[in-house]
Regions:
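Acidic-glycine-rich active-site phosphate/pyrophosphate-binding loop
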Residues: 29-38, 88-102, 140-146, 209-219, ...
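Anion-binding (especially nucleotide phosphate/pyrophosphate-binding) glycine-rich loop
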Residues: 70-105
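Short acidic, glycine/serine/threonine-rich loops at helix termini
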Residues: 18-19, 90-92, 150-154, 329-333
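Claisen-condensing/thiolase-fold acyl-transfer catalytic domains that form or cleave C-C bonds
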Residues: 55, 59-62, 85-86, 99, ...
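Flexible, glycine-rich active-site loops centered on histidine and acidic residues
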Residues: 131-165
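Buried hydrophobic positions in well-ordered alpha/beta secondary-structure cores of metabolic enzymes
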Residues: 7-9, 36, 65, 79, ...
Length: 336
């Protein structure tokens, strides 16, 4: 018997403004609403208001979690915040969230900058903190506002991404079998340029030059200040890295895909998910697809897809895989 972290509660939050396929079709005459749904699997996406940040969304998700009554703010002894949209270069947004949420001051709190793999990385850190006795209850917040990085006429990415946040409570349990893990990680910085906001950091500060908008071969508009995604390269990376990571995880867990009640992958797009499901030969009833109403919410797609499974309280063995920007990826087993 040992101490393990376990996912015991999840709550998500979506900003109020909704961007529908009809809204997008009005901007892109060659893309009717049904074509956008067919291509992306997304019907609507939620968009943060001007002045509404990832920190605001994360706060709302955490407050929704506390409202479930399972845990109080004073019970949290470590805060992990995954975002690529901090309020400030410094201080760390997790410190701002500690104060806003009324958490104790004798806790650990930090941000980490990952995208689509971030939730699984966050689970691994929570598990390490709990198994080593450094924390009993870890609050993992994931939030992003990619809408603020996307040029309105870059239809490829604008149709896919939505803003949102999730709050996940990982709690210590005494158990024979760890409720989190094993984990498999992957990193390949040679793909960094395929999903990137080139300007705005210290390598390439924003200037009048970086704000110059150009049109690509597909008619999408963007500048160096905006998000760029090489969809074809991302697809190739995903179809190679994800099945390989799953094979590695299954070997470590001594399991087959049939042993899992649910397979929850990062909800990149309906097209990528369908390709992966077929490649992995997972039946549709055990393969979670949850992006129609909110799109690709980056680090929050997996917890948002898990939320109904955690809420219904039925014990399940689930396989989680996050993958994307970096390139960064991670796979994990979780017992709910």
């Amino acid at each position: 018997v040992g101490t393990s972290g376990k996912i015991v509660a999840i709550a998500s939050h979506l900003p109020g403004r909704v961007l529908s396929n009809d809204d997008l079709a009005a901007l892109y005459p060659s893309w009717p609403a049904d074509k956008i749904l067919d291509k992306t699997g997304v019907q609507t996406r939620h968009i943060a208001a001007p002045g509404e940040t990832a920190v605001d969304l994360a706060q709302a998700a955490a407050e929704a979690l506390f409202a479930q009554g399972r845990v109080a703010p004073s019970d949290i002894d470590y805060l992990l915040f995954c975002t690529q949209a901090p309020d400030h270069i410094l201080p760390t947004s997790a410190c701002i969230l500690q104060r806003r949420l009324g958490l104790r001051t004798d806790i650990g709190a930090l941000d980490f900058n990952l995208g689509c793999s971030g939730f699984v990385y966050g689970l691994s850190m929570a598990q390490a903190l709990i198994a080593s006795g450094q924390a009993r209850r870890v609050l993992l917040l994931t939030a992003d506002t990619y809408s603020k990085l996307i040029h309105p006429m870059d239809r490829g990415v604008r149709s896919l991404f939505g803003d949102g946040a999730a709050a996940t409570l990982i709690e210590a349990v005494e158990t024979d079998t760890p409720a989190l893990g094993p984990f498999v990680f992957g990193t390949d910085g040679s793909g960094a340029e395929n999903l990137i906001v080139p300007a705005g950091g210290f390598r390439q500060p924003r200037t009048a030059q970086t704000a110059v908008v150009t049109e690509d071969a597909s008619g999408n508009l963007r500048s160096a200040d905006h998000l760029y995604m090489n969809g074809a390269a991302i697809m190739t990376f995903t179809l190679g890295a994800v099945p390989a990571a799953i094979d590695k995880l299954l070997a470590r867990a001594g399991a087959t895909l049939d042993d899992y009640d649910a397979v929850v992958l990062h909800q990149a797009s309906a097209f990528i998910l369908d390709r992966l499901r077929r490649k992995l030969a997972v039946p549709e009833d055990r393969f979670v697809v949850a992006l129609r109403d909110w799109g690709n919410t980056v680090s929050s797609t997996i917890p948002m897809a898990l939320e109904p499974l955690v809420r219904d309280g039925r014990p399940r063995r689930v396989l989680l895989v996050g993958f994307g920007v970096g390139y960064s990826w991670a796979a994990a087993q979780a017992l709910l």
